[in-house]
Amino acid sequence: MSEAEAGVDVRVPPLGDFKDVPVIAILATVGQTVAENDALVTLESDKATIDVPAPFAGVVREILVKVGDRIGEGTLIARIAYTGEAPVTPAPVAPTTGTVASDTTARTEDTIRMQRPAAIDAAQITGADEPAFDVFYPLVVFGAGPGGYTAAFRAADLGLTVGLIERSPTLGGVCLNVGCIPSKALLHAARVIDEAASMANFGIAFGAPQIDLERLRAWKNRIVNRLTSGLNSLAKQRKVEVVRGEARFVSAHRIAVTDANGTRVVGFEQCIVAAGSEPVRLAGVPDDPRIIDSTGALELAARPARMLVIGGGIIGLEMGCVYSALGTRVTVVELSPGLMPGCDPDLVRPLEKRLRAHYEAIYTGIKVAAVEATPEAIRVTFEGAGAPEPQAYDRVLLAVGRRPNGGSLAIEVTGVEVDARGFLPVDRQMRTRVSHIFAVGDVAGGPMLAHKATHEGKVAAEVAAGLKRAFDARVIPSVAYTDPEVAWVGLTESEAKAQGIPYGKAAFPWIASGRSLAINREEGFTKLLFDPDTHRVLGGGIVGTNAGDLISEVTLAIELGADASDIGLTIHPHPTLSETVAFAAEAFEGTLTDLYIPKKG
């Protein structure tokens, strides 16, 4: 009996941080025919249940674990005999032209059957104008942030063989490693500190917090490590090959990837560029370890006594909230007339009022004229009406925005356009002007948001796999995870006024919300903008606790073309913050009973 007939070992794939987990269910039986990805057993951690799938279609010969067994990565759980042909291994290719990565497994997506491209003869790919490659993939994804790994995983699910190029040691990009995720962990800690202090007004007093920066950093890093480990597992499960190193294009179908061992040339048929962005650094600012960007701020190397945040946008204000809660005296300086440019001023006001009570100072309409590093401190000089005298700070955080990485990829050799700001212009299918090269995320223009990147990544992957898809989202929500949070989506009031767009508006103040009063956070409000004729939702904004979670209802309403009555007539649970969205809609319709609004005329 051959190995395929006797059964091939099936082992537990990598599970991230979960090294010792119990088996809670056996989902297959000996003699059962299973399809690829059918669940064989279910494991349970303290946070989630995990199904271990069949890696290929076949007949179960043995089940080698039972309910209650504690197992981990690599544990032998079953043996499965192949039905039909075993997976095909490509024939070796002459080393002068490289090796070819391929997989001929077929998969089904709805009614569309996608076949992974067969092994490609290197001689057919390498032309006179193309250098030889060391490895070839039908699809290469350049960058493993939210847009990149989403594109890679979706493409693999659709049957493509994917190479994922990433320069960092871990997957997840800026968002997961040094952005969205670690910052939200620290913002949660900051909120707990502030809420504990506020409870003294209600008869519950705590002592001053004892802050152990080393343990706080370790907790933040554990969260990041769990998620990056999860991405590694997902890549392995999907057979996405990760190629690590600094990368640059060398031709229309080749990318050179350099690491400590040298340079490899990766060939591809199609490529999705998801190379992200980097922080902008102000000209004239000295190179000093006390002058940091958002990545440095998240490292929590120290708890400075006094810190200046240059930039009053989302990143600067979020990090200001963290350091203020940890005991640092924070000053924010913003060149624009107000904080958080792009957001309606009325939404920013409750946040600014709270921040002014916690921060040392907030300066708007003020320019940083000079930054000098001295042995004692960082001295900063300001310009503008009402500018303070030169000040000395222990830390200076540069948070003046980010720039796309499109200009650092050498992608011009492919014929792809790079605009003056470093963006790669794309169409609604996320294609650049070179049809086999796509771009998603920060390099593709538009708001630099992880949730936009993931949607674009899916579109690009599906188009690359031959599906008819386009990025057709009507709106993309924005969230500042400050305290209070600020979130908005769709048409803003400022945009409507500037563009002369007619609109109707209704707002519900949280001071009239039982839920917001119960949690002692009455400073917020919810507002909605409507088409004055059809009453359809055009946009909305929320400031207050968990605004980032609440804005999704407004986003869905806009996507579905809902009007005020659709929202108002939807029963919302009481008492909740989510019902403030319904109350705002009712206010526009004139049916609200939780406030008295005199009738006009």
In which residue ranges do the predicted regions lie?
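Acidic, low-complexity mobile loops and tails
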Residues: 1-42, 51, 55-57, 103-104, ...
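Beta1/beta-strand and adjacent pyrophosphate-binding region of the FAD-binding site
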Residues: 130-147, 303-315
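Short hydrophobic beta/alpha edge segments that flank linear recognition/processing sites
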Residues: 35-53, 72-86
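FAD-site-proximal beta/loop scaffold in flavoenzymes
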Residues: 288-304, 390-463, 557
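Short hydrophobic core segments
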Residues: 140-142, 247, 265-276, 309-310, ...
